[in-house]
Regions:
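Start-transfer (signal-anchor) and selected internal transmembrane alpha helices
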Residues: 1-43, 138, 158-167
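Residues at helix-coil transition
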Residues: 15, 65-67, 117
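Transmembrane signal-anchor helices characteristic of membrane glycosylation enzymes that use polyprenol
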Residues: 25-51, 59-63, 69-71, 170-178
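Transmembrane-helix signature of polytopic, membrane-embedded enzymes
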Residues: 28-32, 121-129, 148-177, 195
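Extracytoplasmic catalytic/substrate-binding loops of multi-pass membrane glycan-assembly enzymes
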Residues: 48-60, 69-86, 97-111, 192-193
C-alpha cells in the first residue's frame, strides 16, 4: 500500500495545475505535511500559559467553565502572583478587571479544556483549571488546530496548483513564518488557533 502510494505520489508530483491528481498521491502529500508537524510536537512543544496575551486568552475558558462567570479577578490574581501577568485594568462601568483579548481561542479550546478536566478528575491533579492537564490540553488544541489548518491549506493548494508547488509553499509558510513558534513554543497565544 505504501509503495503504491509512493509511486502514485511520484507519478503525480509534476502534473500541471488542474490535472486530475490521484487520491493516493494527494493523501501521501498530506502525510508529508501532517506527520512532520506531529513529530515536531515531541521535540519543540512547550505547553504553558504565560505572558499577558496568553493569560488573557486562557482566563475566558477557565472562568466560563469553572467559575461560570466572566469575572477574571481570581484568575488574574493567580497569574499575577506567579509573575505571568503584569497589569490589570479595571473597567470603569462594571468595576471588574477588563480583558483586552477576545474570547475566540477560549471557544476553540473548550473541548480540549473539558478533556483536561476529565484527566484531572481521574488523576491526582487539581481540578482548579490551572493544573497540568488543563494547560497541556489547551496547548495541544492550539497545535492541532494549526496542523489542521496546514492540512486544509495543503489540500487546496494541491488541488489548485499541483503537488510540488503545494508542498514547497506549505513548507515555506510553515517554516518561514512565526507559525512554527506559535504552534509549539507559545501555544497560549491565539495565532495558532487563527491559522
Amino acid at each position: 500500500m505504501l509503495v503504491q502510494s509512493w509511486k502514485n505520489f511520484i507519478d503525480n508530483l509534476l502534473l500541471p495545475p488542474g490535472s486530475l491528481i490521484d487520491k493516493g498521491a494527494h493523501r501521501f502529500a498530506l502525510c508529508l505535511v501532517v506527520l512532520p508537524a506531529l513529530v515536531l510536537m515531541f521535540f519543540l512543544w512547550k505547553p504553558w500559559i504565560h505572558g499577558n496575551d496568553g493569560v488573557r486568552h486562557y482566563v475566558y475558558c477557565r472562568s466560563a467553565w469553572l467559575d461560570l462567570d466572566f469575572n477574571f479577578t481570581n484568575e488574574f490574581s493567580w497569574y499575577m502572583a506567579r509573575g505571568e501577568l503584569q497589569k490589570i485594568t479595571i473597567d470603569q462601568v462594571t468595576g471588574l478587571p477588563g480583558n483586552s483579548q477576545g474570547c475566540g481561542s477560549a471557544v476553540l479550546w473548550s473541548p480540549f479544556f473539558w478533556l483536561g478536566h476529565l484527566v484531572a478528575l481521574i488523576t491526582p491533579y487539581a481540578t482548579n483549571g490551572y493544573s497540568a492537564p488543563y494547560v497541556w490540553a489547551v496547548c495541544a488544541g492550539t497545535s492541532l488546530y494549526a496542523i489542521a489548518g496546514l492540512a486544509l491549506l495543503t489540500s487546496v493548494l494541491v488541488w489548485r496548483f499541483g503537488i510540488l508547488p503545494a508542498l514547497l509553499s506549505i513548507y515555506a509558510i510553515w517554516l518561514g513564518s512565526p507559525l512554527l513558534f506559535y504552534m509549539y513554543l507559545h501555544p497560549s497565544m491565539s495565532h495558532g488557533c487563527s491559522f
